[in-house]
């Protein structure tokens, strides 16, 4: 995949999000056999594939993005969706994850400003994992937070952005011994 050679940090982030999101999906959906966890994991791992079209000077900018750079960055979900459609790659659900992983429960996300039940459940799962990994990873523009600090920030400052049931279950993944199950 081009993402590996385009930006290794984004590649590592995609792997981390894939792991966290798959863990959350298994915790939420394990009793429902209609969900194909392997195909679902593909969508989680590919969620940022559209960033292979994002210039490195935007991805790795050491300071805040200006309005034009944010507009470029906000295109990556749509560009990833289009790439997978063009290649007829991944399932429809995986492509939806790629398109919707920056949508927020409160309607303040992008690219389509969906809210609540308008957002696919798989995208809601990916959103939580994506934010958690972004907070716990070193980036050119910020230091990393500990997992506890990240969960605290998500709870105190961002809670309205996440499906409340899914977020509570994500927090429980970090209770003693539960993440290894």
Language model: regions and residue ranges:
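Histidine- and acidic-residue-rich, metal-dependent catalytic cores
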Residues: 1-181
């Amino acid at each position: 995949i081009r993402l590996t050679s385009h930006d290794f940090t984004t590649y590592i982030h995609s792997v981390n999000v894939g792991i966290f999101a798959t863990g959350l999906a298994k915790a939420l959906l394990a009793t429902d056999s209609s969900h194909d966890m392997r195909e679902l994991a593909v969508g989680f791992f590919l969620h940022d594939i559209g960033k292979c079209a994002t210039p490195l000077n935007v991805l790795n900018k050491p300071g805040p993005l200006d309005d034009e750079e944010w507009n470029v960055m906000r295109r990556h979900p749509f560009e990833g969706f289009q790439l997978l459609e063009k290649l007829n790659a991944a399932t429809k659900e995986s492509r939806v994850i790629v398109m919707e992983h920056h949508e927020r429960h409160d309607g303040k996300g992008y690219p389509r400003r969906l809210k609540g039940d308008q957002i696919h459940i798989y995208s809601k799962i990916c959103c939580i994992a994506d934010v958690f990994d972004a907070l716990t990873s070193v980036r050119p523009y910020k230091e990393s937070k500990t997992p506890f600090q990240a969960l605290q920030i998500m709870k105190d400052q961002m809670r309205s952005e996440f499906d409340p049931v899914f977020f509570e279950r994500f927090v429980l993944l970090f209770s003693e011994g539960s993440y290894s199950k």
